[in-house]
Amino acid sequence: MRRTTILLAATALGLTPAIAMAEGKMPQMDFSNPLTGAQVVWMAVIMVVLYFVLARWALPRIGGVIENRHNRIATDLETARRAKAEAEHAVRELNLAIQNARESSQGAIAEAVNAAKERARAQTAALNDRLSAQIASAEAEIDSARRTAVGALAPIARDVASSLLQRLIGEAVEPGRIEQAVSALSTQG
């Protein structure tokens, strides 16, 4: 196809002077002048030589360069596709590793939280037991102190009651009756 195109172009180029002369518009193409014919012949010879030089030497080299370039581009595109596939695979693996690490860390955090809660429960239970024991001890001490205080108040209450009754009624009241009344009041209260 290239050769056909080149031959058609050469034929058109060769017919150009004749067409121009037929129209009478180009005096430099006047074939009645002997120099014009020689110039056209040399031009045709140069064109044929140029055609063969281009067809046999330059165009195959240019075609080789174009073919090499096409092969290089195809190779580069294939390399780029492989690199893209490897990069996508690496990104998928990275995302999977990140997801696994996230799940693992969330599991570790949950375990740590549960362990801390369990320790807090144990410490709370131990503290509650200790506080309950201290409260029971304090209540026992308070009860003992109250009994001691009430026990210490009984003789004072007897003496005060005896003195008051003696002043109120003017005579001494029997100590057994005062003891009985103080005992009855201390047990009620």
Curated annotation (Swiss-Prot):
* Topology of this chain in the membrane: Single-pass membrane protein
Principal place of residence: membrane
Membrane-spanning residues: 4-24
Instruction: Kindly give the InterPro entries that the UniProt entry links to this protein.
Output: ATP_synth_b/b'su_bac/chlpt, ATP_synthase_B_chain
Subunit composition and interactions: F-type ATPases have 2 components, F(1) - the catalytic core - and F(0) - the membrane proton channel. F(1) has five subunits: alpha(3), beta(3), gamma(1), delta(1), epsilon(1). F(0) has three main subunits: a(1), b(2) and c(10-14). The alpha and beta chains form an alternating ring which encloses part of the gamma chain. F(1) is attached to F(0) by a central stalk formed by the gamma and epsilon chains, while a peripheral stalk is formed by the delta and b chains.
Instruction: Write out the similarity annotation.
Output: Belongs to the ATPase B chain family.
Q: What is this protein called?
A: ATP synthase subunit b 2
Per the UniProt record, the source organism is Acidiphilium cryptum (strain JF-5)
